[in-house]
Amino acid sequence: MASKKKSSFVNMVVVLLLVAAIAATALASVYQVTKGPIEKAKLEKDKNAVGNVVPEFNNDPVSESDTLAFNERDQLIFYPAKMDGTLVGMAVKTYSDLGFTERIKIMVGFTIDGKIVNTTVLEHKETPGLGDKMDIKKSTWCEQFIDLNIREIEDTDGDD
């Protein structure tokens, strides 16, 4: 029968380092394997969202998108919707920091004359049963914005 090794500080440190190295290697491997499919799924999600919020188009708005970055975290992404080369609308991937948990990512579609075609929530982490009612499957809140002309909205907060 093998004798039991006595625990020592060196033994514990070596075992801990070995476990940490194995866990880090496994985590890095999983990240490398899933990085591509996750990015592809995000692009597909954006493509579907653009299709839901703008008039009919026949170009690839995701590949023609343009980003307006305010800093590393804050940016707007514009997706031009074109029919036979003519701009028919614009989808804007934007956000709101007014959620209770994290940033809410939203896609808003406009016609070229400034009317909102539709909106959709792309990502949120709101509390189920409360804040998640912004999900189109649970509420029709976004219908209030359809056909709203942004050029006719009055500035009520006093800012220019």
What are these regions (language model features)?
Residues A2-D160:
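Flexible, solvent-exposed loop/hinge segments and secondary-structure transition points
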